Amino acid sequence: MATSQVAVREASCVQQNAADNGVQESPEVIAMLAKLEDALDGNLEPSEWGGSSPPPRHVQHQQRPGGHTAFDARNNSGESGGWDGRQQHKRGAGGAGTGAGNERCVLEDFTQCSKSHLWKLMMSFYDRKGVESWSQGIVPHFITCNAFIGRSYAQVLSGFLRDCVRGAGGMKLDPTEPLYIIELGTGSGKFSFFMLKALLEMKEVCDFPVEKMVYVMTDFTESNFKFWAEHPVLKPFLDSGQLDMAIFDAVNDTTIKLSRSGVLLGPGTCVNPICVVANYLFDTLCHDIFQVDQGKAKEGLISVGSTQKDEPDPLDPEIIQRLDNRFSYQDIPDDYYTDEDGDEPHFKRILDWYVDYAAQGSGGMSILFPVGALRALRRLMTFSDNRAFVISGDKGNNNPEQFKGLMDPHIAVHGSFSVMVNYHSIGAYFTSRGGFALHNPQEEASLKVSTFVLTGDSGGDEDGEWTGEAMDRKDLERSSQFPHLEAAFRTNVEQFGPNDFFVMQKCMKEDAATPTLKSVVALLKLGDWDPDVFYKFRDTILNQVSTAVTKLKKDLCRGIPRVWSNYYMLDKDKDVAFEIGRFYYGIREYENALEFYRDSSESVGQHHVTFHNMGLCYYSMGDLHQAKINFELALGMNPNYEKAKSWQRKVHQELNCPEVNGEPSANGTASTTPATGITDARVPTSPSAEWTVPTPLALPAGEEADSPADGLPLEPPAEDLNTR
């Protein structure tokens, strides 16, 4: 059983035991269960939910109103919906949990959700945590930060550009002017690296000159900006001018000042359409809450509170773990939105659509309206006279069927918090303004990816047909003018997209007892040799490569350099260079192994096991003097490291060194006998770290060995070698 599943089962048992004894579980336990359920849904990797702060040692049992849990309703497939699975007017658990048995700290009385204190806490979290939000696994990020999704987005954008070059929708491009690709909420910069790299590699087949593309990383925090500016992998792109950066608040700012070029982007400054990328952003921007009940739209007001009696710092990000939110609903006028820079009729059109849709069934509807995302997109699209391409991936819904029923919104807590993005509303907004949307119809998906296009031609937006299936018909008619975009979206998102890749690697890691090396190589190729995937399956690779057929070894050797070229330093606990060094040692390419051990020492820091493994490389190459130096360096960092002591004695004996004061001294000649085995790893990967001689693998039926060594193990590692 997967680790995350075991954790949920154990936590659930604790919860059930408490209930059996008439004791209500604490908000901390509720938050932990909610986070683990997110892990089961695929929204967090086990390493990511395990990277947050540990649960408190002492748990206070607190009564909550009505004994309700803080979990959202889930369908039979386990997919999380966008709303809490109960109706709670006036009071609700819209966060980690609520507490009625002790005083609730009211941070804010009932107010419109988009103007509430909730979003100030969100800004405070990312401002204070900075890049640590991703590097320490506080916020899940692998699903949107890997080589596969970077390549997928680049292919979709390329399809859009190909259509524009052919004049689709009147969206002509000027190849002499820059094409700005603006990423909102860049965060760590890892996705930016992958997408820009993929675009540059498409130079020979892209219909628009790649050298005129400028990728712009933006975020509102100074710490993130500084991290990008100092990241060595990004420096070549910055120096070439194809990458630029800016501090930009997507909620409030109206212009973007590029730090490298000094260009000021604002209304009417872009000749070519603006291209926008937004992953895991829209779920963190302000939303409004609506319900449609008995043919009337109502707004949801929220009172933000904490289960803790007092909160001296109302912007303390830790409050997110103690959220105790209440909801109330009231009727709204027809002109609810009155100050939206011309978008008032479009917002009204969308709300009217939901009222009409709800009237076709019973039970009403509950809607999160992504007003923050729509405002941010509206401002950006003025840069290019309302001609834009947008691609976004997030946890959300694009099917209005998911909004049926009267329920309070579910707020998922995972270090920070997020809500389900209403991609249907965003698509309706673009359609209302003369554009169109492409949605992935897949229901079971942790990451929903949608693409939106605005052509600058609002003609026809006043034809009066905006309810029922009228919007879908407009989408189909307009998107048909962009056949290459449709084809690229279908291939790279619908047929097998970023969510599918995430599910595949996750299942192979958690559900397969021992994946074969051949299947791991296939996964690596599918994921463009993503370094995180390599790191996840490093044990499989190292344990099976010695018995692999020559063809499979060659496939790995061709791909490993790609792993390194795709490496974006973020989490120093994932020392990819060190693991690549171990791989090369395992196939007896000692010079390559040494190169990556040196890279590991330079990028992550010196480690006694790294020096020990370098000593083994030099020993295997017959350079006993360098082997001796590295074993001594290992012992200098860790005098109690027994393996280095053993190898140091062995080297001294082979050098015929007389002992001085009980220690050998260096002289003598080198042995040409290679060191047997594989090098040490830094982190134990199994209860027993001792190496066992692998059983020779039988060749597949019908496949002949390329050489006498095929299917046979390399010489076994020394018994004193285990993990770092």
Describe each PLM feature range.
Residues 2, 9-55, 72, 78-178, ...:
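N-terminal charged/capping segments associated with class I S-adenosyl-L-methionine
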Residues 260-294, 363-371:
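A short SAM/SAH-binding and catalytic strip from SAM-dependent methyltransferases
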Residues 606-610, 636-649, 659-660, 677:
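Boundary/linker segments of alpha-helical solenoid repeat arrays
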Residues 206-207, 212-219:
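Conserved SAM-binding motif I beta-strand of class I
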Residues 278-341, 411, 415:
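A mobile, often basic/glycine-rich helix-loop segment
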Residues 226-268, 347:
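S-adenosyl-L-methionine
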Residues 348, 352-602, 606-612, 616, ...:
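Rossmann-like AdoMet/SAM-dependent catalytic core
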